[in-house]
């Protein structure tokens, strides 16, 4: 369905246009840049919500609000945008988390004009990726993330920020090489006229060997970004050094771009190769849950421990994608949204806590539950959500992924039993390291022995950010159909095309 008004173009271009306009603002302190960026993000979120509420039809699994503008004649490159039930959830998540991340970044005072400019550029790249319907445009939006994240890390990070930023750019740029090769290979294959249109590529058939090569190239790029072991080692270092508002964007949105690409391109455009790779995805996802949960115990740095838990939770998404069932795939999408909220909240609360107590290592913390009861309450609540407490979004997402792999007709009974058993062990390890982390932070009397120690509890701004994230976590946990209703028709379409192609 083609849109006569360029709603998606406005949504994609507005943040980057506002970012370029930030240079014309008068420099009258950081307050001007804070309010300007927050208002732009809030306007973008409200505009996105309006467009989806009044111009998007849930019962239509076809691409909606489609826009098509030819940009380069030689290579058939189009500014081609469109959304469906698969992309609407990540787009709303992006707007929600980015708006709250700008509020979380208010304590940033050094070169705040550039800081907020980079956040707005990231915003455009993320929205553009989730709404792109052209393979080269997808790659451009994918790359648009790299430079802002690198600068946010290298300029506003911790003591080892340059090492972490360099490691991040090397990993992600290396993965992007494989992504570019796959994009060019699929676009140029088998036709005198190259095509990068998702719709035409979905009907393209390839020799099995070539499809496997394309699939593997895309998989490497997504394995770096998601991340999937063993290409995950950049993540703990990056989260350990980044400012917590940057961590919110990384954990809430950036990691989900890889999982989205795995569904949108690998599963939708390369189904035969995905059928061959799916058992390996399930195996790697299962190992990832156990491995990341186990290594989390050895992390003394608070944010690095939460980063390892993010890697562990991404394993459920990989398993859901590899299950090749509508239940498992719905669970993977629900986990994408659920962990986007929970991961962003945990990094926000850990960052605000570390700013107050001036410690980042768990063995230096202790006894802050009494002087900071609000932070203690919110952090404990999100820890419960992360360990899949019933009534919260994490529980529903992991349960649906469990059901998806158990009911998958692709796997035999014994492998399914073994996989679910190992997943259950991972779910047992999760509360162990999360509750251990909470005990080291909030209980004991270590910090009370510090002379003249005084800690300020969460203020109105931080409490507002925490509650805003907590509400959808509870809402999805109580009524998950609000997410399933967006994606269920599209997933059925992907799987029907997948099996009958």
From Swiss-Prot:
The record's EC number reads 7.1.1.-
Kindly report, in one word, the top-level EC class recorded for this enzyme. translocase
Q: Where in the cell is it found?
A: Plastid, Chloroplast thylakoid membrane
Q: Which GO terms describe its molecular function?
A: NADH dehydrogenase (ubiquinone) activity; ubiquinone binding
Question: Matching InterPro entries, A to Z?
Answer: NADH_Q_OxRdtase_chain4 (IPR022997), NADH_Q_OxRdtase_chainM/4 (IPR010227), NADH_UbQ_OxRdtase (IPR003918), ND/Mrp_TM (IPR001750)
An example GO CC term for this entry is:
chloroplast thylakoid membrane
Per UniProt, the keywords (alphabetical) are: Chloroplast, Membrane, NAD, NADP, Plastid, Plastoquinone, Quinone, Thylakoid, Translocase, Transmembrane, Transmembrane helix
| Catalytic activities | a plastoquinone + NADH + (n+1) H(+)(in) = a plastoquinol + NAD(+) + n H(+)(out); a plastoquinone + NADPH + (n+1) H(+)(in) = a plastoquinol + NADP(+) + n H(+)(out)
Q: How does it sit in the membrane?
A: Multi-pass membrane protein
A Pfam family found in this protein is Proton_antipo_M
BP GO terms, sorted: ATP synthesis coupled electron transport; electron transport coupled proton transport
Enumerate the transmembrane spans.
Answer: 5-25, 38-58, 88-108, 114-131, 135-155, 168-188, 209-229, 243-263, 273-293, 306-326, 331-351, 387-407, 417-437, 464-484
Regarding protein family, the annotation reads:
Belongs to the complex I subunit 4 family.
What this protein is called in its record is NAD(P)H-quinone oxidoreductase chain 4, chloroplastic
Q: Which organism is it from?
A: Dioscorea elephantipes (Elephant's foot yam)
């Amino acid at each position: 369905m083609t849109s006569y008004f360029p709603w998606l173009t406005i949504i994609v271009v507005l943040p980057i246009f506002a970012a370029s306009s930030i240079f014309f603002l008068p420099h009258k302190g950081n307050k001007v840049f804070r309010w300007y960026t927050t208002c732009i993000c809030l306007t973008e979120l409200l505009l996105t919500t309006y467009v989806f509420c009044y111009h998007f039809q849930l019962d239509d699994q076809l691409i909606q609000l489609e826009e098509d503008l030819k940009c380069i004649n030689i290579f058939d490159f189009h500014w081609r945008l469109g959304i469906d039930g698969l992309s609407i959830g990540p787009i709303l998540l992006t707007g929600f988390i980015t708006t709250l991340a700008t509020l979380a970044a208010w304590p940033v005072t050094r070169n705040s004009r550039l800081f907020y400019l980079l956040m707005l550029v990231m915003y455009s790249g993320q929205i553009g990726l989730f709404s792109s319907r052209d393979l080269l445009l997808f790659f451009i939006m994918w790359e648009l993330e790299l430079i802002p994240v690198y600068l946010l890390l290298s300029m506003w990070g911790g003591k080892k920020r340059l090492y972490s930023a360099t490691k991040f750019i090397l990993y992600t740029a290396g993965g992007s090489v494989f992504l570019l090769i796959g994009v060019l290979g699929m676009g140029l294959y088998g036709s005198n006229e190259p095509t990068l249109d998702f719709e035409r590529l979905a009907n393209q058939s390839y020799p099995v060997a070539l499809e496997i090569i394309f699939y593997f190239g895309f998989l490497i790029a997504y394995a770096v970004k998601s991340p999937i072991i063993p290409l995950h080692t950049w993540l703990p270092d990056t989260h350990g050094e980044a400012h917590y508002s940057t961590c919110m964007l990384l954990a809430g949105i950036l990691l989900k771009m890889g999982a989205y690409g795995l569904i949108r391109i690998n599963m939708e455009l390369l189904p035969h190769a995905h059928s061959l790779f799916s058992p390996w995805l399930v195996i790697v996802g299962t190992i990832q849950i156990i491995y990341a949960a186990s290594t989390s115990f050895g992390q003394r740095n608070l944010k690095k421990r939460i980063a390892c838990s993010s890697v562990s939770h991404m394993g459920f998404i990989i398993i859901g994608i590899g299950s090749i069932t509508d239940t498992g795939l719905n669970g993977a999408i629900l986990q994408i949204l659920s962990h986007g909220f929970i991961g962003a909240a945990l990094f926000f609360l850990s960052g605000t806590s570390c700013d107050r107590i001036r410690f980042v290592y768990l063995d230096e913390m202790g006894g802050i539950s009494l002087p900071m009861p609000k932070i203690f309450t919110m952090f404990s609540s999100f820890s419960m959500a992360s360990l899949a407490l019933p009534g919260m979004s994490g529980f529903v997402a992991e349960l649906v992924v469990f059901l998806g792999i158990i009911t998958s007709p692709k796997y035999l009974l014994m492998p399914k039993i073994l996989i679910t058993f190992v997943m259950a062990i991972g779910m047992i390890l999760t509360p162990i390291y999360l509750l251990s982390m909470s005990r080291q932070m909030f209980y004991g009397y270590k910090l009370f022995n510090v002379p003249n120690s005084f800690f300020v509890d969460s203020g109105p701004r931080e409490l507002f950010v925490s509650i805003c994230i907590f509400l959808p976590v509870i809402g999805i946990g109580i009524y998950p159909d609000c997410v399933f209703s967006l994606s269920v028709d599209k997933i059925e379409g992907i799987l029907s095309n997948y099996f009958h192609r």
